Amino acid sequence: MRILLQLFGFLAWSIHSFANPIKVEVKEVNGKWSFYRDGKPYEVKGAGGHDHLEKLVDIGGNCIRTWSTDNALEILDAAHAKGLTVMMGLWAQHERHGFDYDDPVKVKAQLDAFRSEVMAIKDHPALLMWGVGNEVDLFYTNTNVWYAIEDIAKMIHEVDPNHPTCTVTAGLDKEEVRLIKERAPSIDVYGINTYGDLGNIKKNIREYGWTGPYVISEWGPNGHWEVAKTEWNVPIEQSSHEKAVVYEERYRDYIVGDADHCIGSFIFLWGQKQETTSTWYGLFSERGETGEVIDRMQRIWTGKEATNRAPILESCLLNAASKNQNVKVMAGDRMEALLKVSDPDGDRLVVNWLIVPESTDIKSGGDAESAPLPVKRKVTKGSKDAVSMFAPSEEGGYRLFVFVYDGHGHYAYENIPFWVNKRSAEMGQARMIQMKKFDSINP
């Protein structure tokens, strides 16, 4: 998915001296493409983000991806200390943010800035590959950007013979494949950010004419643009359990399932962010808890179960309706929610219910969004699996979030979008009660 990064600044980069860069190549051997790091095959089990590195190592990951060179040396050093490698991003500017790829002065300035950045860190032992641009094709009209991508990739090969280059597109499009092949031949690896369409990549990339290796540079749950919507046009999010099932199936069927050409992948997002909701893409809570997705990835990557696993949230209903049933209530009316959740370790669970207004700060391409504040009232009584509350007094769209914590650094979640209709004056006002948490023990 797409993270908004600062416009490139022409900062003074100093060249760092490293004892011995580790050579990375991309080679085809007996019909199978692979990374070769220090002469040995290297399968990328990656994550998009640069925090929680110890957790990534614990679950069997070996590589992280950045989108820019911000704090590059610090990130490389931290990764190297944990035995991880880095796909280092070079944030090529986007047309949708106002950059003009017909302006030779700006294009050259960007190239010169990247040259300095590459020279500074090219010999770091944690460096795996250069990510030359991320989704520069998103909502673009000027295809000259691919000539600029070629200039950057060609420059990298001139100054750094030890690391391959990759460029990343938003999904996979036949025209982009053609343009990259024709205009950016110095790109070694095709990077694809894809979500619900991951299952079509193996077939499409061959049909579109890319015969070399590729990485799935971002993947995860169904994107907010790919799912069903309510009658009031907001997307319906998968629960933590639904996402866990999807991650496991997609990895086994579509990433491992194209081992001849897919030479690695990066689960998204190795962190937390607001994008449509606070939970859509992040694999961590705001406090750093992890969910069922990470448990499943650990089992896939290591063959071992986590010593303590996240709760499994099987279902949640609001007024006896699921999230797919366009729940509507009157302002101030009492609502009833039912939850079915279990913990594989029998841990004591804490359940937290929140009513949050539907986000109005919706951006595109992963640009930064502000999170709406929860409605600070309404829960009247509850237990681990049931709660009663009053609907908000203001008309509009909301989401009922439920978060379940096991006290061991794990959580589960679900949200149900609902619409509040305006209450007429003669209907009277409902009593408002402060929201709180409920603590309960697994049966």
Name the predicted role of every residue range:
Residues 171-202, 224-228, 271-278:
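Substrate-binding cleft/loops of secretory-pathway carbohydrate-active enzymes
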Residues 388-394:
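Residue-level recognition of secondary-structure-to-loop junctions
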Residues 29, 37, 41-46, 57, ...:
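Substrate-binding clefts and catalytic carboxylate motifs of secreted carbohydrate-active enzymes
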Residues 27-30, 36-187, 199-200, 209-210, ...:
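Active-site mouth of glycoside hydrolases
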Residues 420-427:
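Extracellular interdomain linker/stem segments of modular secreted and single-pass surface proteins
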Residues 1-20:
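Bacterial Sec-dependent N-terminal signal peptides
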